[in-house]
């Protein structure tokens, strides 16, 4: 089904956070994450003025840290870039094609079935791992149920937890 394929794309997209999933990309992200004055949850809240947050991640883009939140509003998708020092919206770009559009479509499909918001899922994951910092939260479907794949940085270790959204 289209929804099943969308869910697979969404979960596969989670692995794209580290570009080529190389150690260098992970090391850069771990190092740069310390420079952020806000957490992922604050970025999610800041993006809400641009629609329903459907995924969020810190990433390294051209050697610089970036906080990106995908939102859905009135059937359209947007990438909201958040200033990781102030928590203010820097830029809003429509997502209309390509891999980003496919990812946003699958994430939106998963969130449409969710009873829990993305921020609530992140808060719950953090509460179960007190010292960890959230790197990303990307929803998808697992066995027909909406689940958020949440990447946590605990010390120098990255780990992924699956947080049910229903």
List each model region and its residues.
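Long, terminal "pre-/pro-" and other extracytoplasmic accessory regions
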Residues: 1-166
